Amino acid sequence: MFEINVDPVAFSIGSLVVKWYGIMMALGVIALVSWIFWRIKRGADISYDTVLTAAIIAIPSGIIFSKLLHVIDAWEYYSLNPGAILSGEGLTIFGAIIGATIGLWIYSRYSHFNLGYLLDVAVPGILLGQAIGRVGCLLNGCCYGEYGGSGCSVIYTNPASAAPYGVEVVPTQAYEIIFLLCLFAFSLFIAKKLRPDGQLFLLYISLYAAWRVAIGFVRVNDDFALGLEQAQVVGLILIALAVPFFIYRQRKQKEADKNT
């Protein structure tokens, strides 16, 4: 068992309260953009202007959809506290991914850059950013797992933590950090083996969605539908869309290779 006694608030300046969760989210975004810039320096066929514009579009669209999914999931609370909709709390990773992807797709229709290529280049950076963001969840005490003692449980002893005080819980945040870092390494290995552009992103969506469905049975969350939490429902939908599309595109690519 491990003890976490961290104040979720990193520091405050007057009425401005800065939490570790927000800091880690910001660092995750910085890691993603930095990764893409590093890939450009290594020869990736994307302009800096395209990346900057993409970030300006993807970040707000990701935040909006991220919050939207949480509002839908916790509508009973938000209907009674509408002002909380504008707070920085309660963001969902699937909402961020979906919102950012939609924003980038719209942008690509106007600027005509290769969206699939950009998403593939970004995948390792996305995974690094997610891992950093989950560190924020671990420090904050949110997104924890089932109650009860085990050899790898954690106990939060700061009264301000989002986790129940003094109760052993499964550190699903830490499990996800490990999974994301493993998926990061795998993405580097498999990237050059996948064609056409966009396949790495589809594989990432499929594998991460499968993970969220599985870990959802350990996490403590309210049921959304069919006895599943919202992330599990969204994950199943994404798997149903991404996996067949991935397989279809792989087969089309093999046929194209045979004809050349």
From Swiss-Prot:
Subcellular location, principal: membrane
Keyword Zinc: no
InterPro entries per record: Lgt
Classification lineage: Bacteria, Bacillati, Chloroflexota, Dehalococcoidia, Dehalococcoidales
Record's function text: Catalyzes the transfer of the diacylglyceryl group from phosphatidylglycerol to the sulfhydryl group of the N-terminal cysteine of a prolipoprotein, the first step in the formation of mature lipoproteins.
Protein name per its UniProtKB record: Phosphatidylglycerol--prolipoprotein diacylglyceryl transferase
Localization in the cell: Cell membrane
EC code(s) of this entry: 2.5.1.145
Binding site for a 1,2-diacyl-sn-glycero-3-phospho-(1'-sn-glycerol): R134
Keywords linked to the UniProt accession: Cell membrane, Membrane, Transferase, Transmembrane, Transmembrane helix
Pfam families named among the record's database cross-references: LGT
Gene Ontology MF term list: phosphatidylglycerol-prolipoprotein diacylglyceryl transferase activity
Residue ranges of the TM segments: 17-37, 52-72, 85-105, 113-133, 170-190, 198-218, 227-247
Species this chain originates from: Dehalococcoides mccartyi (strain ATCC BAA-2266 / KCTC 15142 / 195) (Dehalococcoides ethenogenes (strain 195))
One GO CC term on file: plasma membrane
Entry superkingdom: Bacteria
Top EC class of this enzyme: transferase
Family, similarity comment: Belongs to the Lgt family.
A biological process from GO: lipoprotein biosynthetic process
Membrane topology of this protein: Multi-pass membrane protein
Pathway: Protein modification; lipoprotein biosynthesis (diacylglyceryl transfer)
